[in-house]
Amino acid sequence: MKDTKEKVLVIPCSGIGKVQGLIAREVALQVADERLPEHTKTLCLALLVKGDEEAVAAIKASRCITIDGCQKLCSNKNVELAGGTILRSIKVAEAFKDHKGAQPGTATKLETDGWQIVSDLAATGAGEVMAASEGKEQ
């Protein structure tokens, strides 16, 4: 993994089988691939859980944004265990409070409400990355 020292790592939960997990992964991809590819990089949580040396080293050398679908906070907890610095912990489940009655979709396909939640959370994550890159960590 190159350039991780300068880039913020975005680590979503795996969240297999849950719409919140799909939202977490889509938020990570939107931040890292679409909004701020020059400032961010994604890291697969499974590599970190497995103890992959390269993944652990990247976590220790980088600032991170974790994105968790549920209250188990797997991404957040594993980044902390690996010694990472967490700029922001985004919790998808909490976002549903701002979207009461939303019909986000399923574990495999997001509907319009789900994409709106992704967009809102990606804006939060991107804002955090930009603040950090300007030295104004929130």
Over which residues does each language-model region extend?
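Iron-sulfur-associated redox domains of electron-transfer enzymes in respiratory
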Residues: 1-138
